[in-house]
Amino acid sequence: MYLQELLKGIQVEKIIGNMDIDIEDIYFDSRFVTQKSLFICIEGFKTTGSLYINEAIQRGAVAILSEKEIAIEGTTTIKVENSRKALAAVASRFYKFPTNTLKLVGVTGTNGKTSITYMVKSILGYYNINVGLIGTISNWIGNKEIEAVRTTPESLELQKILNEMVEQKVDTCVMEVSSHALELGRVDHTKFTMGIFTNLTPEHLDFHEDMDHYRNAKKKLFYKTTLCNIINVDDIHGKMIAEELKEEQIPLITFGMNQQADVYATDLKINLKGVSFQLHMGQDSKEFHVKIPGLFTVYNAMPSILICYILGLSLEEISIALEAMKGVPGRFEVVEEIQRNSVIIDYAHTPDALENILISTRKFAPKRIITVFGCGGDRDKTKRRIMGEISGKYSDYSIITSDNPRTEEPLKIIEMIEDGIKQVTDQYKIMIDRRCAIEYAMKIAEEKDIIILAGKGHEKTQVIGNEVFYFDDREVALEIARKEGLI
């Protein structure tokens, strides 16, 4: 595509050089630049793309787009006000505006995004509908799995994936949309058929400053939709968003446990094997069963059912497919091989998520709940004390350990968690090494105790300092169980 065509619709402040050149690819990472490509300099948090212009040119870039005015002999340079926004616009055009063709469902909120996207993929896939998924665990183009680097890909990668979905005849893509992606413009120039709001609890406040900024970032999704939005109004922030959207006459459907919602659930039954509930939608009512325990499962199932219903499936069809679903990796995942007591792997790494899983487990726990958890380093520090209080309040015994300490001192993170837990209980132990913490939990657990390994879920790495080590909670639990003769 010619550079002049590629830059249509972008506010260009200055161009130096020839615009009549053919661009064969686009990059923002100089390490991957190829011949006849456009290199876009992204202003990052740790470095800036303009430092890598020479490398990009050496590798074959024929044009440079930057927020800085640069003159380079033999290379076309383009100055723009915001290179991230320009990247999104250029990427969408280069990959032929894939969301003009593809049905795209965006799911945003602090918790529940992964579970909802997997539920929708599972339900639609049950009826052989070609489905795409973009999210935290992995990306899927039909039956092809692609590794996910972040919850929502950078705009260039996103448009490339969406374009491949169109080429592979994918009917619908369901996608996790993070607040970072919305705030940083990764989903600019992307049309969503539907937008889903799950809930909002303190998270990423190191980035968003406060809850108002966090909510406003999430709300941006609902102005990008072409059909409707589905909002959880049991959540105070969801209720605020719904009221604002109604005032602006933006189509939406509300859901919750409250019968004032457009769609609501009653007659909940929750145990270790799953949940059942009655869903009420207008004049229709239907019982649903899901093999994932917890109240949060009902909150995840309701929008999933609505999405699939709007996309054309009947409630009966959805019910059959949802009951057949086995679960979501690292989301209340019971390690079935261990029988003496229940070991549950969950991604709960926010105060709300940890509280939800502990309260849900308490409702059917026959004996003690032993929780192994930590908090990530180089991330929001305000949640550490809160999570300590929550584990202390709802667990019978807690083991505070490491969870991706990154460049922070692990013990310092643990001490901040301890500040919270010691306010409510003395039933806890500190063990910096996560493997040792899991082993200790399994050694002290008695028959029918429930061990919750919280925070990492599907993750298969532990980040300590600047090094990444292989670590899988599930595999570690199984290794210890075999060693202790529990399998």
Curated annotation (Swiss-Prot):
Pathway: Cell wall biogenesis; peptidoglycan biosynthesis
Catalytic activity: UDP-N-acetyl-alpha-D-muramoyl-L-alanyl-D-glutamate + meso-2,6-diaminopimelate + ATP = UDP-N-acetyl-alpha-D-muramoyl-L-alanyl-gamma-D-glutamyl-meso-2,6-diaminopimelate + ADP + phosphate + H(+)
GO biological process, alphabetically ordered: cell division; cell wall organization; peptidoglycan biosynthetic process; regulation of cell shape
Motif (Meso-diaminopimelate recognition motif): 403-406
Residues found modified as N6-carboxylysine: 218
Binding, meso-2,6-diaminopimelate: 379, 403-406, 455, 459
Needed cofactors: Mg(2+)
Subcellular location: Cytoplasm
GO cellular component terms attached to this protein's record: cytoplasm
Pfam family, one: Mur_ligase_C
Coiled coil: none
Keyword Cell cycle included in the entry's annotation: yes
Changes after translation: Carboxylation is probably crucial for Mg(2+) binding and, consequently, for the gamma-phosphate positioning of ATP.
Entries under InterPro entries matching the protein: Mur-like_cat_sf, Mur_ligase_C, Mur_ligase_C_dom_sf, Mur_ligase_cen, Mur_ligase_N, MurE/MurF_N, UDP-N-AcMur-Glu-dNH2Pim_ligase
One Gene Ontology molecular-function label: UDP-N-acetylmuramoylalanyl-D-glutamate-2,6-diaminopimelate ligase activity
Predominant location: cytoplasm
S-S bridge residues: none
Similarity annotation: Belongs to the MurCDEF family. MurE subfamily.
Function according to Swiss-Prot or TrEMBL: Catalyzes the addition of meso-diaminopimelic acid to the nucleotide precursor UDP-N-acetylmuramoyl-L-alanyl-D-glutamate (UMAG) in the biosynthesis of bacterial cell-wall peptidoglycan.
Protein name: UDP-N-acetylmuramoyl-L-alanyl-D-glutamate--2,6-diaminopimelate ligase
Organism, as annotated: Alkaliphilus oremlandii (strain OhILAs)
